[in-house]
Amino acid sequence: MGPVQHPAGLTEAQACGSSVRNRPAGQQGQEQKAMPAEPPHSTVTEGGRTLEVRWIFPGRLEPAVAGWFGRFPAGTESREDTYLLDPRLRGLSVKVRGGGELEVKVYRGSPGILEVAGRARGRLESWQKWSFPFSPPGPDRGERAGWRPVRKRRRISRFSRASSQIVARVPGPGQQPECGVELTEIRVRGQDWWSLGFEATGPAGLLRSELQATAALVFAQALPGGMEPGTDDSRSFAEWLCQRPGTGSDTGA
């Protein structure tokens, strides 16, 4: 297999973790010119542990499902994430997030199954992530070998405990334990999909209880049409992309 190409602005050194210090002087100069300039204060951001569950479904998001999710206050976001698929790095999820940072997630295992009786069942996944800022040097030139762009339009609600009860709040910055819930419209290689995901953050000992309490609240009202998310549809974005490559083009999506 030939050398892996990377999205604009991401050099081989950034993608593979190699150092330019041990390279010949001429090669160092070439690589330094290729790398986008970053402010001196740029640092790696460690997001800590998360506990997540996600379901991904084929087809367009139905208005009835959007209405079901609309019971809670939500923010919206549209962006394109680009995932590294080849080489496949087991236990790692690598993506360029919205063109502004490289995000690396390490899989820490599954503590079991989330089950909301009669409403939903999915595989819980524990992750730890790091973010590396970078700036693309020029406009995107389309899909690069080994990478898969995914267009997303997300509705995001956040839930936290208050007076021993789980309550929804308007999305925003904060350090308190919480669980984010996102309903996402997906466009990849000319195909429409949608996803429902939960992500708990905060102290490790509270992650599962936060996620379970949030899921119980969200699924207190069943999904429209008797839909019941199950383990067959439960997986991370990276795993799903490797298993369902899709066909066609995103042109005009």
List PLM regions with ranges.
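Hydrophobic, proline/glycine-rich low-complexity stretches
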Residues: 36-45, 50-53, 245-252
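Charged surface patches that recognize polyanionic ligands
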Residues: 40-49, 56-178
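Mixed-charge, glycine-accented linear interaction segment located at domain edges/termini
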Residues: 190-246
